[in-house]
C-alpha cells in the first residue's frame, strides 16, 4: 500500500505534466482534442481508481505468489533475463485479460469507463475502473509460475508495465515506422478506442502488438476511415462512479426482466452488448449504430461551472497527495474514511458538472461529511495542521464557499452551449 502510494506521488505529477504539454502542443497545432468537462471526468476517474488500488479494495481470486509456491517446476534467480521473461508473460496475460473485458458481457463493466470518453487524449489514459473489484489475471501467468519466476520480479515489473501504457493515448503522434510491427503505438491504440465497426474489438495489446497479430485481432489504422471515439451505448454523464455501474445495472435489470430462465443465466457470459430478445424489444436502450450518428455528450456547463469544477478537482488532488504522503502514519480506518471522502468529493463535483438537479444536495452532504471529520479530529485534518495552522477549519471554509458558489450557479441561467469538437484525423 505505502510503496504504491509513494510511486504515485512521483508518477501522477509526471502524467499531468505530459497532459499539459499535449494540450499546449495541440493548441499550437490548431487541433481540438480536449474538452474541459471531459478532461475533468477523466482525471477524476483516475483519482477514484488509484484510491481504490492504494486502499487494496480488490479481492484476489488467485495470486501469482500462490501459483509460484504450488506449481513451480524449478526455482530460478532474478537475473535480467528473468525480468525480461516476466515482462513478456505479463504482457501476454494483459492481452488476454483485456480481451476478456471487451468480449464478455459481465467483464465489460470493469473496462467501459476507459472507453467512455468521446475524445482521445492523454487524460483518457487515466480513465480507469473502480468496478474491477476482483483480480484473477494470475491465471494467465501460469507459464511464468511454472518456470518459477519469483513473485517479487512480477511485483517490480507490474507498475512499470502499467505506467508504460500511458503515452500512446494521443492523436498527436502519427505512424512510427518499424515500431508499428512490434509495439503498441498511438496509431494502434486509436483503432482500439474507436467505435467504427471496422475497428471494434481490435488491438488489445498493451505493450507488444504481436499478440494481436498472432491471435487475429490486429487492425491497422486506415487514412480513409478516421477513428470516432466512444462506446456504442453512450454513457451521457461526466460522473465516473455512475459510468462504473451503468453496464452492470443494465445486466441486472435485463436478467430480472427477461422471462427466460436460460437468458437470466447466460446474459452474464454472452458477447458484450447481448440482451435477451424479449427485454430488448420491451425496453430498448439508446445505441449508436454508425459513427455518423454520434452526438457527443455536452451538459452545457458554462465557463463559470467549469472553473468551479476545475478548482474542486485541484483541491481533491491536493488532498489525495496529502493522504499518500501520510499513508504510512495513519491507521487503516482513517485511511479508509479519508479515501471515502475523496470519492464523495469526485461524485459531488462531477454530478454538478452534469447539471443534475441533485447536485446541491450531494454537495451539502459532502460538506457535512468533511466538517464532521474535522470536528472529530478537534479541528485538524489528518495531521495537515502541523504544517498549516487551522488547516481543518480553513478547509471547511473553502468547502462552504464551494457550496455557496454552486447554489449561485444553479440559480443563474445555464452557460451558452460549448462548441462540438471535431473527431480529427491523426497527425501524419
Q: What kind of feature is each model-predicted range?
A:
Residues 1-15:
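Hydrophobic transmembrane alpha-helical segments in integral membrane proteins
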Residues 2-5, 56-75, 138-154, 158, ...:
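Juxtamembrane "helix exit" motif at the C-terminal ends of alpha-helical transmembrane segments
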Residues 6, 10, 33-50, 332-340:
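Loop-to-helix transition at the N-terminal end of transmembrane alpha-helices
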Residues 8, 119-124, 167-309, 358, ...:
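Cytosolic/stromal cytosol-facing helical appendages immediately following the last transmembrane segment
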Residues 16-24, 88-103, 162-174, 185-188, ...:
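Transmembrane alpha-helical segments that form the membrane-embedded catalytic/substrate-channel core
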Residues 20-40:
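Membrane-interface helix-loop junction between the first two transmembrane segments
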Residues 44-59, 78-241:
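Membrane-embedded catalytic scaffold of the fatty acid hydroxylase/desaturase
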Residues 297-415:
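Substrate-recognition/cap regions that form aromatic- and gly/pro-loop-enriched pockets
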Amino acid at each position: 500500500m505505502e510503496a504504491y502510494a509513494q510511486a504515485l506521488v512521483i508518477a501522477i505529477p509526471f502524467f499531468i505534466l505530459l497532459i499539459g504539454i499535449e494540450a499546449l502542443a495541440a493548441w499550437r497545432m490548431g487541433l481540438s482534442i480536449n474538452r474541459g468537462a471531459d478532461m475533468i471526468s477523466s482525471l477524476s476517474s483516475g483519482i477514484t481508481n488509484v484510491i481504490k488500488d492504494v486502499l487494496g479494495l480488490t479481492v484476489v481470486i488467485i495470486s501469482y505468489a500462490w501459483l509460484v509456491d504450488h506449481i513451480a517446476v524449478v526455482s530460478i534467480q532474478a537475473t535480467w533475463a528473468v525480468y525480461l521473461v516476466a515482462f513478456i508473460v505479463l504482457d501476454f496475460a494483459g492481452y488476454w485479460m483485456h480481451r476478456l473485458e471487451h468480449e464478455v458481457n459481465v467483464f465489460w463493466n470493469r473496462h467501459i469507463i476507459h472507453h467512455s470518453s468521446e475524445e482521445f487524449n492523454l487524460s483518457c489514459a487515466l480513465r480507469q475502473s473502480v468496478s474491477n473489484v476482483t483480480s484473477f489475471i494470475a491465471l494467465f501467468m501460469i507459464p511464468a509460475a511454472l518456470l518459477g519466476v519469483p513473485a517479487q520480479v512480477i511485483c517490480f515489473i507490474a507498475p512499470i508495465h502499467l505506467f508504460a501504457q500511458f503515452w500512446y493515448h494521443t492523436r498527436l503522434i502519427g505512424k512510427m515506422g518499424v515500431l508499428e510491427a512490434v509495439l503498441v503505438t498511438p496509431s494502434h491504440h486509436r483503432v482500439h478506442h474507436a467505435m467504427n465497426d471496422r475497428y471494434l474489438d481490435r488491438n488489445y495489446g498493451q505493450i507488444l502488438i504481436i499478440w494481436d497479430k498472432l491471435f487475429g485481432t490486429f487492425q491497422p489504422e486506415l487514412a480513409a476511415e478516421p477513428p470516432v471515439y466512444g462506446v456504442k451505448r453512450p454513457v451521457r454523464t461526466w460522473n465516473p462512479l455512475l459510468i462504473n455501474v451503468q453496464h452492470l445495472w443494465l445486466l441486472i435489470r435485463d436478467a430480472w426482466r427477461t422471462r427466460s430462465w436460460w437468458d437470466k443465466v447466460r446474459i452474464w457470459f454472452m458477447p458484450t452488448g447481448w440482451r435477451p430478445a424479449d427485454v430488448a424489444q420491451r425496453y430498448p436502450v439508446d445505441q449508436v449504430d454508425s459513427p455518423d450518428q454520434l452526438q457527443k455528450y455536452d451538459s452545457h456547463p458554462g465557463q463559470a461551472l467549469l472553473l468551479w469544477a476545475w478548482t474542486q478537482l485541484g483541491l481533491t488532488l491536493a488532498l489525495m497527495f496529502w493522504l499518500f504522503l501520510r499513508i504510512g502514519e495513519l491507521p487503516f480506518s482513517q485511511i479508509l474514511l479519508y479515501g471515502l471522502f475523496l470519492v464523495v468529493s469526485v461524485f459531488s463535483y462531477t454530478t454538478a458538472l452534469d447539471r443534475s438537479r441533485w447536485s446541491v444536495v450531494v454537495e451539502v452532504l459532502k460538506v457535512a461529511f468533511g466538517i464532521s471529520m474535522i470536528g472529530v479530529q478537534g479541528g485538524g485534518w489528518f495531521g495537515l495542521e502541523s504544517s498549516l495552522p487551522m488547516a481543518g477549519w480553513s478547509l471547511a471554509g473553502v468547502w462552504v464557499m464551494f457550496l455557496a458558489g454552486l447554489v449561485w450557479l444553479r440559480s443563474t441561467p445555464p452557460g451558452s452551449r460549448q462548441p462540438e469538437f471535431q473527431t480529427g484525423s491523426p497527425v501524419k
